């Protein structure tokens, strides 16, 4: 191990580190150093660097202790010098805290130990020095309990068991006939310490360590060890924090909030973390230590008078009771409060962000223990950024970068009422496929969702094992969708996001019985008509009806979007199949439609009947008769899209799915189709069997359909061109792009383009008029990417269909990946779900290669993506660096993509 500096001291307005050293000192250590340097009262201490955490896992506990010992002993002497106390001394013992601190905030995920250095001699010395034996023994029992849990592993043996120390405390309170910990006497606390030690001896076979240095090394190594505990690992996964970052450890002289009625501890925020309101707020406890505030053992009180009054009103507590039982810190300690208010304002002005601060008041003296940029909701994030911009605290670029694109989701969808959700019964959990909140009666079939809405005006929750395009109308009419199978990019998930519809997919615990129309899950039975609620942001499914409220899009949101548009280079379009989708996307700032899936148009009303006539036709003439019925319908649909986009580009993808998706596969559905079509059932059965494929995703679909049945391409091309000309004739500008799907060979595209061009020329001749249009292709077959130079000879634009391109490049089925994806993620084989976050090293390199080769042949070639990755922030950033012109995503992801595009441009500068 290299001879480098591993320990950095701070105290008395001096520090060896500073706020810019987050990677080395962690967020806590860096900010403690910085607070010292700007004159904030901070107890002295030292920080062991994050690099030591990596060394701990590489070389082990003993090697790290041996390596650290000289620097730590020297740093401890610095604390002793500044405090006038000595670590391990019997007369003036120095007590310290040991805390974690990664470079990214991970509140509550790792371990903390307070009052370290306590033993049988130190407790008597503290009691004598302070004249407060109860405080001394209370601090001792807290230390034994914390150390026992964190370092010695004295935790419940099973989820049914209680904390062994809490059991002992409850027994002591019961024995004494008291309710609160604060009611225990000094003698009671002495007895608790004896009983705690006995419990440690019984469970571990060892005496509780009395040597302060042994205690310290045990605590330091335990904090390093907590970097890899289950909750820390999960938190890192959820927040994309790399495991290799490690945590720092900060050792700090103790200050005590539990010395009596003139002492306290608390947590505060410089602004409201839930709403973003510019209101100093927080909670505190008299005669307590920091862990008490977050543990919920006692009811904390509000810091400010205004906050206290708001809290009391919400709790239906009278002003008299509030003032006498729950007074604010502002009322109880006005001088200390004034200093705290000045410090929080100073810190916010200094760090230029909303601050989360921890403090302790020891015998009337205020000490700051931590400050960090506070966690906040999506709504608060936007409001705080825009407010600080207006206040002149930050500039436009900082305001944009301060807002996380993914958190905008919280602003765009309905949300559950916070009070209602706390009392809701969770029955299972799936994947949070599409954000939002939905509640309604259960139905199992798409047509029943339609009937429920038509007959009662109530939207239902559509519950399916999995969905298909045939369920589209039911999905549209449902309040939300719940599926037992499918991942984040399954049909249900993709379509739901496009609709802005709440969806929970892949809830594998569900036992769905279509015959009895019931769900069995975790001991609950839910019948058709019973109410359930879905949380599309967490994947949780609740029994019964949970109250929801509409998302509130304030003026701050619009201002943020304007700023995003100002700085972004990458354009953002929407995947939209209907004028309603297009209008929604346009409202969110989409600059065109990057993908219109024409097949979705065929499932509404009588359209499916005409399309099935085409499928059943025995020859081309029969197919053309059926297609003639579809022509005016398609033309009308396209007119609506062109009008909604008002001159922005509209990319229409020609028919893509295999024909088997348009026919029923169950006996009941086939009989119904035979009756509606007035043909023998056997003909339906035979046609369905003839359309079946072993691997339809790689089968007779996309351009292969258009090349074998060119009349389909002719009809769609005519509908598109005629619609564009009709809309332009009404005074609305149009920008038409026709996209051929699933091209793997430039000859396939050349054949399709020939059909499109000849059809367009025919329409131009009939109308004695012309209109500009472009023909391009969807790059979703790997061969298309590597032969992009040949394809660019024909294509006027590329749109990367990253859903299928990911499937074909990785060899993963997006509908079946759920069977092994969790294992691959756990083992580190995959870092992310490749259908959610673009595989930049594999699929991404194909995209780069295709763009390079395509523009080598056609320099002004327009390139974009239209897969679900188009709304994922890191994938959008990749698209910016890869030189794409636009991304296209679901309407409700448009704001996220716009903000991500602005981030990419600003980071590049």
Predicted regions mapped to residue ranges:
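Nucleotide/phosphate-binding sheet-loop regions of phosphoryl- and nucleotidyl-transfer enzymes
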Residues: 1-424, 458-461, 468-473, 479, ...
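Glycine-rich phosphate/ribose-binding loops and adjacent secondary-structure elements
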Residues: 365-367, 461, 468-476, 480, ...
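C-terminal accessory/binding modules appended to enzymatic or scaffolding proteins
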Residues: 14-22, 434-477, 843-859
